Amino acid sequence: MDGFGSDFSVGGSSSGKVDTGAIMEQVKVQIAVANAQELLQRMTDKCFRKCIGKPGGSLDNSEQKCVAMCMDRYMDAWNIVSRAYNSRLQRERAKM
């Protein structure tokens, strides 16, 4: 197999037609997963750099609290920006 079509079904029809709606939905899901992974990676990197001065075998209490608070703030900020962006997109689409 070439890897591209391995996760896609052709819609279960015997006619051989590709179900483009199903493929589009799978692509959307894969993009959403990739975006979530990127968000988590960025958040982890930023909070690690901010909170962990000298990496060691374990985190002390203050580092644990810093990482937890940093991640909470990061997610809060991301949610605010995401809502504002989606709201703006909806307004722009309504103008068209």
From Swiss-Prot:
Span of the annotated motif Twin CX3C motif: 47-70
Subcellular compartments: Mitochondrion inner membrane
Main location group: mitochondrion
InterPro entries (UniProt xref): Tim10-like, Tim10-like_dom_sf
Biological process terms in GO annotation: protein transport
GO molecular function: metal ion binding
ATP-binding as UniProt keyword: no
Superkingdom, taxonomy of origin: Eukaryota
Membrane topology qualifier: Peripheral membrane protein
Keywords assigned by UniProt, alphabetized: Chaperone, Disulfide bond, Membrane, Metal-binding, Mitochondrion, Mitochondrion inner membrane, Protein transport, Translocation, Transport, Zinc
CC per GO annotation: mitochondrial inner membrane
Keyword Cell wall biogenesis/degradation assigned: no
Cysteine pairs bridged by disulfides in the record: 47-70, 51-66
Record-stated family: Belongs to the small Tim family.
Domain statement: The twin CX3C motif contains 4 conserved Cys residues that form 2 disulfide bonds in the mitochondrial intermembrane space. However, during the transit of timm13-B from cytoplasm into mitochondrion, the Cys residues probably coordinate zinc, thereby preventing folding and allowing its transfer across mitochondrial outer membrane.
Functional summary from the UniProt entry: Mitochondrial intermembrane chaperone that participates in the import and insertion of some multi-pass transmembrane proteins into the mitochondrial inner membrane. Also required for the transfer of beta-barrel precursors from the TOM complex to the sorting and assembly machinery (SAM complex) of the outer membrane. Acts as a chaperone-like protein that protects the hydrophobic precursors from aggregation and guide them through the mitochondrial intermembrane space.
Subunit structure: Heterohexamer; composed of 3 copies of TIMM8 (TIMM8A or TIMM8B) and 3 copies of TIMM13, named soluble 70 kDa complex. Associates with the TIM22 complex, whose core is composed of TIMM22.
Protein name: Mitochondrial import inner membrane translocase subunit Tim13-B
Organism, as annotated: Xenopus laevis
